[in-house]
């Protein structure tokens, strides 16, 4: 066997080994946590027996946090859809430099720590006691944090050349702006809307830093309850809470992978770029074929 093939096998084997070690490093703690939530005694392991009593205890104590997290996530999604989709369309259609500045400002909450965003909200709206003690205060923070994901996902689709051409064609046929937006823009922007919606739901349910600063004893969400369970109760209870958390978030993550969703909209942008390149190639071929098709007519005219 040639020397370079041996070296290649060694390198591939080394990369595979490193990859498996990294996967084990990340997966083993999750598996151990799940097992701790299903065993009678974590320190004795599976030999102590399997049980669902910890899950039952967690559900009895924290089901209010579960439903509150779902309500906050759905409210956040509704607001980000109402604001993000029109904003993404406007940013994609605008050619002003201010639109680019606005887009960068929308992404700013992602770059800032969640604690900084929470402190800003507390300093401005913390004096409104009714608002401060309601779930809508947390919803406001989640909207600020998740809105960029909705805007970028939808804007990547709206910036596509084919969508612009369809809009121009509908406008030339007399369609109003509302008709174009409802019958052309929204149906074609569906992949970006679905991507943004899944990202918003996942991020809202799992957000901890921002929620920790904004919550009150009456507005304890799922991640806050998870931290409380690990800090003040048995390890088995906290691990059972982890199982409950995974049962809520894993379906969303699987849906994102199954649908090929990229929260930042990169995949949608790549698809739009591919369509644009295909359209440009088609136009180039048509222009190249035009002189060939007109040559016989020109020669006949000369005769």
What are these regions (language model features)?
Residues 2-15, 98, 155-167, 171, ...:
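C-terminal transmembrane helix and the adjacent membrane-cytosol boundary/short C-terminal tail
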Residues 2-8, 74-106, 119, 123-127, ...:
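Transmembrane-helix boundary motif in ABC transporter permease subunits
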Residues 3-11, 41-42, 55-61, 205-262, ...:
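Interhelical loop and adjacent transmembrane-helix boundary motif
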Residues 4-5, 43-44, 48, 52, ...:
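Membrane-interfacial helix termini and adjacent extracytoplasmic/periplasmic loops
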Residues 15-16, 64-68, 126-150, 191-192, ...:
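Loop-to-helix entry region at the N-terminal start of transmembrane alpha-helices
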Residues 17-27, 144, 151-154, 177-206:
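Transmembrane alpha-helices
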Residues 28-31, 35, 82-86, 119, ...:
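Membrane-embedded alpha-helices of multi-pass transport/permease systems
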Residues 63, 67, 71-83, 87, ...:
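Hydrophobic alpha-helical transmembrane segments of multipass integral membrane proteins
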